[in-house]
């Protein structure tokens, strides 16, 4: 069984009810944070997970709304890990991830220096193990395996999706993308597909070109549902709602998905959980 928790279902626009894009995946006693949008650790704490308990951080791409709280994750994990010789945090993402992590740590160098000067048991900066990938296996530990494949969020490039597998259960996390062959292949036969969705029918009517532009490189509800159908997944989990999902409108979004996908559809607020079982 794999458990998926939608930590942040929001967008780049601040929302008092939704944290920035982030998803928690629990499998085989391991805990993976996929993207780290604003407010992610507060939502994780509400779900019973602290930064020190993360097995790895997985980044789909380097847009600010998906990595905005990277510094908080790095520093909070560092100061809340009390075991000697802490294991470096594995950070897996597309090319550019190492530069982003290094720049983030450099921006926080004063804070890091203050804490090292103050605490005798902190004698080194936060330990990280950054790995950049665009395709193939990236994790194989205690029965949990993860592989990545390219997605299409151009001009943001490269971008990747993740497939997590454990004891026959499988979950694919698409990140931001339009329909593409890489995601179709990655999601083939998966138990669940976690996919960003936007209401292009609404966004296209907003009289600001900059906002209309987001239609170019995101999937609509119907497009995400069509991807789920092509890939033959069991459950479509929609997240990163643009515009924000309003209470009472859930059935509108479900109806749009149902035009293309006959399977189970999950959507909801931050901390919504979905259990994904192995096929019986």
Swiss-Prot record:
The keyword rRNA-binding does not apply. The active site is at 65 (proton acceptor). InterPro entries: AtsA-like_MBL-fold, Metallo-B-lactamas, RibonucZ/Hydroxyglut_hydro, RNase_Z/BN. SMART domains: Lactamase_B. Pfam families: Lactamase_B_2 (PF12706). Zn(2+) 2 binds at residues 65-66, 176, 240. GO terms for molecular function: 3'-tRNA processing endoribonuclease activity; metal ion binding. Its EC number is 3.1.26.11. Binds 2 Zn(2+) ions. Homodimer. Zinc phosphodiesterase, which displays some tRNA 3'-processing endonuclease activity. Probably involved in tRNA maturation, by removing a 3'-trailer from precursor tRNA. Belongs to the RNase Z family. This is Ribonuclease Z. It comes from Mycolicibacterium paratuberculosis (strain ATCC BAA-968 / K-10) (Mycobacterium paratuberculosis). The lineage of its organism: Bacteria, Bacillati, Actinomycetota, Actinomycetes, Mycobacteriales.
